[in-house]
Amino acid sequence: AEKQPNGEMRDIQTQSIAIGDGLNYEKPACNPVLTQKDLPEGFSKFDFRDPKIWREADGTYSVVTVCLAEDGSGAAALFQSKDGFDWHFVTVLERCNNQYGKMWECPDFFPLDGKQVLMLGPMEMLPKGEFHNGHNVIAFIGSYDEATHTFTKENVQLMDGGIDFYATQTTLAPDGRRIMTAWLQTWSDTEDKPQGCKWFGQTICPRELHIKDGRILQTPVRELDAVHGKRTFHENVTVQGETSLEGIKGRVADLTVTVQPGEYRSFTLKLAADADHHTSLTYDPYTSQLTLDRSYAGSRADIVHRRSCKVRSQNGALKLRILLDKNSIEVFANDGEQTMTAWIYTP
């Protein structure tokens, strides 16, 4: 920590390494291996964190970190090392330029289906388009020239339009799939643990990532299919008023629903519902808005409980897959073109 002129103590952020076998680790004397002196001039020593490291095909190592640039907003910096101990600065992959929030967090940088993705979590965003206030997770999709270490973004997308989704990280499965996890919570509700709850917070069901038409698609990992229990099917159901379907009940379910075009103003699914509680998912075919609302899920906290995102409808048709767990809901629209995620602490 460093004492400021006003007497405040501020932590200095540096990067260090530890060597171990998965259980026991030792910190070498060369730590820290990256400090402010390794950053471009004007970058902050107080905001330099969240390293994501990977091994390149030639055996060298790369790491992407986030830092605060001289303009007071985030940047993603790339470093490389031959041995994992001696690191050098390579380039700034992307700058916020005060367009996407302020400081950035939890960066990731990886190839996907012929494109290159820089994924990270902006803090303090203002609402614009599909982005909402506060913490978001966004992906810059583009190309990467390895010879010049130049990342060129082509598209920018929000990774989840729900309420609780942050701090994404990916890994490469042995079969080549890019698998993503995330914190199924957000900083704004970390102090609102339900009374009597012995734990708080979780991660999402791991998701496979692919790119189609310049956009990242997210689907639950295929391993989930192997653990399904009883399957129930309903076809060509005409819904009038409030309708319950036989065999569709419980707090743990993997639901696939296809909403067909029709003369209706809105369509609502009530999930984790009893006489006093429910979480609703409402589709408005006229505006193509999908709204997740947990206002009646049982939380007493004064936090965000409702959020909407625009989905692509085909003349009013919409396909939904919903992972309902005891304390969470994950929604995948149109085979993962959009997702919406939220925790629920329904009794």
Question: Which residues does each PLM region occupy?
Answer:
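Beta-rich carbohydrate-recognition and catalytic domains
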Residues: A1-D50, R55-Q99, P111-G161, L184-H234, ...
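Beta-propeller and closely related beta-sheet repeat lectin domains
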Residues: R49-K52, E105-D108, Y166-Q169
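Beta-rich accessory regions
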Residues: I138, S143-D164, Q169-P347
